[in-house]
């Protein structure tokens, strides 16, 4: 138990301690903090209290404006930091609890803070690792007989996204303009996307990277994974459908990707590990791992339209539905010698279960726009309207506590007028 009061339904008990980057009106410099209850502990203020064998030599990483350097220190530093923080925040420890002057400088209410991206994201890769999602999309566009492409059950399919347009929760997303071909009997047209969608995803940040030309074996992959966030991979389906052959997504995805600001460390998620999904056929040896490494994370998506008094939940899913694990994703990404770096972001792909209510995109929930999605108060949707706010939340449920991720939210702004 912490000396900081934490409600039972708080996302941020002492069992969590996620890392983020924040600023305040009184101190506009972005700095590294840890969430506890409704407070933020400023690590730049208490860096001198990290006196373990690793961090005593690297206290300066907590003076930086991003988590990249801390991410790059590796598991020994992360575990040492977590143990120190849990000790300092414990109700039985006086060092921080009883130092009123230090406490006053070290803690900030989350309500008064502005959150920033937790890391400088050098590269962003999006995978396509939900069997149900891949099957659903395949049925819609290719038919039931050709739902899965031949490679899907053999490797974690992915594509390189646009790191520059990854934004932190709360950043508005402008409806994109682009080229579409709504009528195959007519030439393509240019205009605002009419099929703007959300995608329920999660993502993980890379810790230490690998040298150029040297793959990360799956037995070592866990050592390179710092922590996880929620993600909304906004998608313009009409732009995407016209452009994606033969090289895959481009402008239909690159206009905006939202992540939650708090990075939940993997050690906070390990109590919620569950068996990996059965993979048939068995993957090639470089992708095989026996240790469980997927997680029971309850996920939900809510939509709040303009004029709606409250948001309506349109999807409930779970991260455990993923077919390919994050260890497999990381290893496959590096198998050709591609070098990953601290702060790189690797995303899961849309998270869909077998139940229609667990489908993680409006493309699936509306079945390509043929079914209305009830969002309450007499309103329905097939795709997103201007003014709609999408709010993704997620948590692991423990005994009397929960390890949560906060919110991943964004509101749709109207498209700019064509030039």
From Swiss-Prot:
InterPro entries: Fumarylacetoacetase (IPR005959), Fumarylacetoacetase-like_C (IPR011234), Fumarylacetoacetase_C_sf (IPR036663), Fumarylacetoacetase_N (IPR015377), Fumarylacetoacetase_N_sf (IPR036462)
Residues given in the record as Ca(2+) binding sites: 126, 199, 201, 233
GO annotation (BP), single: arginine catabolic process
Top enzyme class: hydrolase
EC number: 3.7.1.2
Record carries keyword Acetylation: yes
Tissue expression from the record: Mainly in liver and kidney.
Residue numbers bearing the Phosphoserine modification: 84, 92, 309, 417
Disulfide bonds: none
Cofactor names: Ca(2+); Mg(2+)
Binding-site residues, Mg(2+): 233, 253, 257
Subunit and interaction comment: Homodimer.
Protein name, per record: Fumarylacetoacetase
């Amino acid at each position: 138990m912490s000396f900081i009061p934490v409600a039972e339904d708080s996302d941020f008990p002492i069992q969590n301690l996620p890392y983020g980057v924040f600023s305040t009106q009184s101190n506009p410099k972005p700095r590294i903090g840890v969430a506890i209850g409704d407070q933020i502990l400023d690590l730049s203020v208490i860096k001198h209290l990290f006196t373990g064998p690793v961090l005593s030599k690297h206290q300066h990483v907590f003076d930086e404006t991003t988590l990249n350097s801390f991410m790059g220190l590796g598991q020994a530093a992360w575990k040492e930091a977590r143990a120190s923080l849990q000790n300092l925040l414990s109700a039985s420890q006086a060092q921080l609890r009883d130092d009123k002057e230090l406490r006053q400088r070290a803690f900030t209410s989350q309500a008064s803070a502005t959150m920033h991206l937790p890391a400088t994201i050098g590269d962003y890769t999006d995978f396509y690792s939900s069997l149900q999602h891949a099957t659903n999309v395949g049925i819609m566009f290719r038919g039931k007989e050709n739902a899965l492409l031949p490679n899907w059950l053999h490797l974690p399919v992915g594509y390189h996204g646009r790191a520059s347009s990854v934004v932190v929760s709360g950043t508005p997303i402008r409806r994109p303009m682009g080229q579409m071909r709504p009528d195959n009997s007519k030439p393509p047209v240019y205009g605002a996307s009419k099929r703007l969608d959300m995608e329920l995803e999660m993502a993980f940040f890379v810790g230490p990277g690998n040298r150029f030309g040297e793959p990360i074996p799956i037995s070592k992959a866990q050592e390179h994974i710092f922590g996880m966030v929620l993600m909304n991979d906004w998608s313009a389906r009409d732009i995407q459908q016209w452009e994606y052959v033969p090289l895959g997504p481009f402008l239909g995805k690159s206009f905006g990707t939202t992540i939650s600001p708090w990075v939940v460390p993997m050690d906070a998620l390990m109590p919620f590990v569950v068996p990996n999904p059965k993979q048939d056929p068995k993957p090639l040896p470089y992708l095989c791992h026996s240790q469980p490494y997927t997680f029971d994370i309850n996920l939900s998506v809510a939509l709040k339209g303009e004029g709606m008094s409250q948001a309506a939940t349109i999807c409930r899913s779970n991260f455990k539905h993923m077919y390919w694990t994050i260890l497999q994703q990381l290893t496959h990404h590096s198998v050709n010698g591609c070098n990953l770096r601290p702060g790189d972001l690797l995303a899961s792909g849309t998270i869909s279960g077998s139940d229609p209510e667990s489908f993680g995109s409006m493309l699936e929930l509306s079945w390509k726009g043929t079914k209305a999605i009830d969002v309450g108060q007499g309103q329905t949707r097939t795709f997103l309207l201007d003014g709609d706010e999408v709010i993704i939340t997620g948590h692991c449920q423990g005994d009397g506590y929960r390890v949560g991720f906060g919110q991943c939210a964004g509101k749709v702004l109207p498209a700019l007028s064509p030039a």
